[in-house]
Amino acid sequence: MLSEFLKDYLPIIIFLIIALGLSCAFVVVNLILSPKHPDPEKLSAYECGFEPFEDSRMEFDVRFYLVAILFIIFDLEIAFLFPWAISLGNIGGLGFTSMMIFLFILTVGFIYEWKKGALDWE
């Protein structure tokens, strides 16, 4: 059983080990070869060659993060719906019921967000 598992997944495991090794090697090479004391001019915010008028860190409205998180949640919902819709004929009643429960939970969450005013932009 274990040998069949290794036979099936050995190329993937080797690929992951090589990718992890190369990533670590690139990070180490970057740390070794990069300049340690960068020019202060390069650390300043770039504003068309002028001196920066103000701090480059601006306040960012939290609603943007909320919209991004809601987008990711509903984007993942669609990512789960496509394979489900394709295999709907093969999964039977249990697969249909589990997806309806999943959609119900997401719909309740969406209605809760709507009622709390998280989707209102004021």
From Swiss-Prot:
Enzyme Commission number(s) of this protein: 7.1.1.-
Transmembrane annotation, as ranges: 12-32, 66-86, 91-111
Main location: membrane
Localization annotation: Cell inner membrane
UniProt entry tagged with the keyword Secreted: no
A GO molecular-function annotation: quinone binding
GO cellular component, one term: plasma membrane
The keyword Transmembrane is annotated on this UniProt entry: yes
Reaction(s) this enzyme catalyzes, per UniProt: a quinone + NADH + 5 H(+)(in) = a quinol + NAD(+) + 4 H(+)(out)
Keyword annotations from UniProtKB, A to Z: Cell inner membrane, Cell membrane, Membrane, NAD, Quinone, Translocase, Transmembrane, Transmembrane helix, Transport, Ubiquinone
Membrane topology value: Multi-pass membrane protein
Subunit annotation: NDH-1 is composed of 14 different subunits. Subunits NuoA, H, J, K, L, M, N constitute the membrane sector of the complex.
Entry protein name: NADH-quinone oxidoreductase subunit A
Organism the protein comes from: Pelagibacter ubique (strain HTCC1062)
Taxonomy of the source species: Bacteria, Pseudomonadati, Pseudomonadota, Alphaproteobacteria, Candidatus Pelagibacterales
